[in-house]
Swiss-Prot record:
GO cellular component, one term: plasma membrane
Identification of the protein by name: Type II secretion system protein L
Subunit structure: Type II secretion system is composed of four main components: the outer membrane complex, the inner membrane complex, the cytoplasmic secretion ATPase and the periplasm-spanning pseudopilus. Forms homodimers. Interacts with PulM/GspM. Interacts with PulE/GspE and PulF/GspF.
GO BP: protein secretion by the type II secretion system
Family recorded in the similarity comment: Belongs to the GSP L family.
Keywords, ordered alphabetically: Cell inner membrane, Cell membrane, Membrane, Protein transport, Transmembrane, Transmembrane helix, Transport
Task of the protein: Inner membrane component of the type II secretion system required for the energy-dependent secretion of extracellular factors such as proteases and toxins from the periplasm. Plays a role in the complex assembly and recruits PulM resulting in a stable complex in the inner membrane. Provides thus a link between the energy-providing PulE protein in the cytoplasm and the rest of the T2SS machinery.
UniProt superkingdom: Bacteria
Membrane topology note: Single-pass membrane protein
Organism: Klebsiella pneumoniae
Subcellular location: Cell inner membrane
Xref: InterPro entries: ATPase_NBD, GspL_cyto_dom, GspL_pp_dom, T2SS_protein-GspL
Length: 398
């Protein structure tokens, strides 16, 4: 999914070919004659690079490098579907989970449409975009730029491939030489709205006025909302470098306050008495970290005061480092949610209560944590939507 709003302004539409070395492009500008062209790395034609300096780019990538899936989420994973996708699809993949990127195309309650792409392929596509200096609006599988036919398929020929959009969130690319064999053996083939001259193959073709892939994409700007750049590959916002002396405090603030607000209050906010529960949860969480303080009036303000003291005195550098390491491990492990967090100063240890969508997710989290901590496993309880339990992470320098 993509947060960019569609626009009537000029957009550079680029289709990166399956060879990942060449591309075709079209400048779609309302009211103007469209410019089109091809890009080759050795041609020395600067046209595409010059256009990229003035116009945002919508990049279509080969669906032949994508796999489309539908999955049903467990009840407990509805709010954080991205973390569960890898484990739900693991048995259907031809590659290792760690080598795959999962993009959520659409979610309706527990029903999810997902595109799976090799992480190496995503890196190569992004590197290609960066090499041309593209300001990328979206990275979209090419078949999803075709019009959606509610009663059947839509199709267009692009180079040596036929592209088919088979439903709202899925499609396929077929090499021309294999098209006859594919369609001949397809049972109950849906009507095919065809935007290229139909091949001489027996199929329920419905010929339409000829348009190429980029023309169809230009007429379907809503498809820009479909974007593979999610998770590790999400667009990075440009920002000014942070002065080095502030970084430890910022890391601590983000780790403490993010974990505080996003995780520890999650279950409380689901209750009817949201305000009272949130206030009490804030105080309870604050007391976990500062157990000697009896008078807790404004936890957020008091936390900020402690952070200022940490900056001025250079206090708790090891704790800041460990919180940063823990946050990174959680970010890198799909299907994990931190429920509570406390620090045992006597043992120099972080104490966690976590929930996971599966025992495999929990084991993956534990393995990653062992690279930075000594991990002790406490009580574990199976649940309908996964497993929850307690872990103690002791610093290796203790």
């Amino acid at each position: 999914m993509n947060n960019h709003h569609t626009s009537s302004a000029a957009v550079l539409i680029i289709r990166l070919n399956p060879d990942a070395a060449t591309a075709i492009w079209r400048l779609a500008a309302p009211g103007d004659t469209a410019q089109t062209g091809e890009w080759h790395p050795d041609a020395g034609d600067p046209t595409l690079s010059l256009l990229a300096q003035r116009h945002p780019a919508w990049v279509l990538v080969p669906a032949s490098d994508c796999a489309f899936h539908r999955v049903a989420l467990p009840a407990g994973a509805r709010r954080r579907p991205q973390q569960a996708l890898a484990f739900l699809l693991e048995e259907q993949l031809a590659t290792e989970v760690e080598e795959s990127h999962f993009a959520l195309l659409h979610q309706h309650k527990t029903d999810c449409a997902v595109a799976v792409v090799g992480r190496g392929k995503m890196r190569a596509w992004q590197a290609w975009c960066d090499s041309l200096g593209l300001s990328v609006l979206a990275l979209t599988p090419d078949v999803l730029a075709l019009p959606h036919s509610p009663t059947g398929w839509s199709a267009v020929r692009c180079g040596e491939q036929w592209l088919f959009r088979c439903d709202t969130w899925g499609g396929m690319a077929v090499e021309t030489v294999w098209l006859d064999q594919l369609l001949t053996h397809w049972q109950d083939l849906a009507p095919i709205a065809c935007y290229s001259p139909p091949p001489d193959i027996a199929a329920p073709w419905q010929p339409l006025p000829a348009q190429d892939l980029l023309q169809l994409a230009a007429a379907n700007p809503d498809a820009r909302r479909i974007c593979l750049r999610q998770g590790d590959f999400a667009a990075k916002r440009r920002r000014q470098p942070t002065p080095r002396r502030w970084r430890p405090v910022i890391v601590a603030a983000l780790a403490l306050l993010l974990l505080w607000s996003s995780n520890c209050l999650h279950d409380h906010l689901m209750l009817g008495q949201q305000a009272d529960a949130a206030v009490q949860a804030s105080r309870d969480f604050y007391r976990q970290w500062f157990q000697t303080e009896k008078n807790v009036v404004n936890p957020r303000l008091q936390m900020q005061q402690h952070l200022r003291q940490m900056k001025n005195a250079g206090a708790r550098p090891a704790l800041i480092s460990r919180l940063g390491a823990l946050q990174q491990i959680i970010d890198d492990t799909p299907g994990i949610r931190l429920r509570t967090l406390s620090f045992d100063a006597a043992r120099n240890a972080l104490q966690l209560e976590i929930s996971a969508v599966s025992s495999q997710a929990l084991e993956q989290f534990s393995q990653r944590a062992r690279a930075r901590f000594r991990v002790q496993t406490g009580e574990m309880k199976p649940r309908a939507d996964g497993i929850e339990g307690r872990l103690t992470l002791e610093g290796n320098d203790a």
